[in-house]
């Protein structure tokens, strides 16, 4: 009897609901994130900014865990979410403007500012657009190309909302000027450039997915998620 080999991919959700206690890769990802989060939570440059920046991250983890049984994603999507949260936690530890990775990029590539925030925005668009698309395609039963396009809009919307929340936080902060400088680093177009980088990352990922799908099925606009 020939056994069927289970296929795992970015665009195909698992056909079998795996209990969390048996999902070793996901357990490992969660353990890595918890350890990294705990380490970066120790002595951040600015503790208030740290908890402000990571409040939403903790909410994402809670919501993702709550919907694990009802709407399980592929482990590749979970890996993308975890990697973004780690990159974000690292930036928040150094208030982004002082992140060593960005300082290295600044010296090596000749940037005029610490561009780690741009890197994280690019990663947000690239990594998080995949699970968003997966939810739209498999849970909401949208056509494949619709799911890809709408996921791009969702990424841009979330990035814009984050920029607005930073403005509100700065308005309520006692050290308003310090917060603005640490986030924008003197760039008056900081929010727009962050959104553009998120858009670029999402477009690259979704564009690649559409290209791969087109090579396999020319009628991509008619493709819906299988029941």
Model-found features: residue ranges?
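Membrane-interface capping segments at transmembrane-helix boundaries
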Residues: 210-220
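Hydrophobic alpha-helical transmembrane segments
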Residues: 27-31, 51, 77-79, 149-153, ...
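Internal alpha-helical transmembrane segments of multi-pass membrane proteins
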Residues: 140-156
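N-terminal membrane topogenic signal
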Residues: 14-31
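Short, highly charged, low-complexity non-transmembrane loops/tails of multi-pass membrane proteins
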Residues: 219-227
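Interfacial helix-loop-helix junctions of multi-pass membrane proteins
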Residues: 49-50, 101-102, 116, 159-203
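"…centered on the first transmembrane helix and the immediately adjacent amphipathic helix/loop
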Residues: 32-126, 130
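Membrane-interfacial alpha-helical segments at the cytosolic side of multi-pass membrane proteins
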Residues: 59-68, 123-139, 172-177, 195-212
């Amino acid at each position: 009897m020939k056994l069927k080999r289970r296929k795992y991919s970015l665009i195909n959700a698992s056909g079998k609901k795996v209990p969390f206690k048996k999902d070793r890769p996901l357990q490992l990802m969660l353990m890595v994130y918890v350890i990294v989060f705990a380490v970066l939570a120790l002595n951040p440059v600015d503790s208030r900014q740290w908890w402000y920046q990571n409040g939403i991250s903790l909410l994402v983890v809670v919501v993702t865990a709550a919907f694990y049984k009802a709407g399980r994603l592929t482990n590749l999507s979970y890996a993308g979410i975890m990697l973004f949260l780690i990159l974000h936690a690292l930036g928040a530890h150094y208030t982004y403007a002082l992140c060593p990775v960005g300082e290295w990029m600044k010296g090596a590539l000749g940037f005029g500012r610490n561009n780690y925030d741009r890197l994280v925005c690019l990663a947000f668009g690239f990594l998080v657009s995949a699970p968003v698309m997966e939810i739209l395609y498999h849970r909401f039963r949208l056509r494949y190309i619709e799911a890809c396009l709408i996921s791009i809009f969702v990424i841009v919307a979330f990035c814009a909302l984050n920029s607005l929340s930073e403005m509100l936080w700065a308005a309520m902060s006692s050290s308003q000027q310090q917060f603005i400088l640490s986030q924008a680093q003197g760039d008056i177009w900081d929010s727009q450039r962050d959104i553009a980088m998120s858009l670029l990352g999402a477009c690259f990922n979704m564009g690649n997915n559409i290209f791969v799908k087109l090579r396999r099925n020319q009628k991509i606009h008619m493709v819906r998620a299988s029941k």
